[in-house]
Amino acid sequence: MAGQTDPHISLFSPQEVEFMAEDELVEIVPNMNMEQLNFISGDFGRFIPQIPTKVPLWLAVALKRRGKCTFRPPGWMSVDNLTQILEAERESQSTFQALPFSYVEIARLLFDHARDDIPDMYMVRSLVEDIRDVRLHKLETNLGSFQGTSAVKISNVSAMEVNIVRPFVIRALEAFYKHDKPEADVDRDTRSSRQQRETNNEPRRPLRQR
């Protein structure tokens, strides 16, 4: 897997998050006969024309590019379902609606490679983008309320949203542990540091001449 973009804050790039999402299973309808495919991640197929089967997203994209299958969009990508989710997201400022962990990346890959297989594609894309924007706004707003808390629980966040929150949480925990350090430890560290400085500043004993 690609290395982390910034090791200090453990932030992944959008390309890295999308790469990890490509292991999600999606349903396709093959238009060819093919024997079972064996991978480290599992066995997929065999593939029979017009018989739906589930494969990793990366494999589905590869088959689609070769004209070997069509996609069956996941149920959550329907206009009706996305409209309900968007309304619920707007109504609540403190909770997030349940969506696949990689919903943004899955939708983006389907828009790029299987737009002809998605009913009302432009409406679906608009709804997904609106949902993403509303959730990001809520997330940014709620981050300010986490100041001074020792524990935070956020349910139903996506991979992209976790990636955004991670740097904030790391910095908050670092500050929490720094300020929560017992005074005894601080005093001990201070004394040790002072003793070290005094030792370093002591005059050196002259060497005895032979």
Curated annotation (Swiss-Prot):
Keywords tagged on the record: DNA replication, Nucleus
Annotated localization: Nucleus
Keyword check for Nucleus: yes
Top-rank lineage group of the source organism: Eukaryota
GO BP annotation list: DNA replication
Matching InterPro entries: GINS_A (IPR021151), GINS_bundle-like_dom_sf (IPR036224), GINS_Psf2 (IPR007257), PSF2_N (IPR056784)
GO-annotated cellular components: nuclear chromosome
Region (Disordered): 182-210
Coarse class of the protein's main subcellular location: nucleus
Function: The GINS complex plays an essential role in the initiation of DNA replication.
Family that this chain belongs to: Belongs to the GINS2/PSF2 family.
PANTHER family: DNA REPLICATION COMPLEX GINS PROTEIN PSF2
Summary of subunit composition and partner proteins: Component of the GINS complex which is a heterotetramer of GINS1, GINS2, GINS3 and GINS4.
The protein's name: DNA replication complex GINS protein PSF2
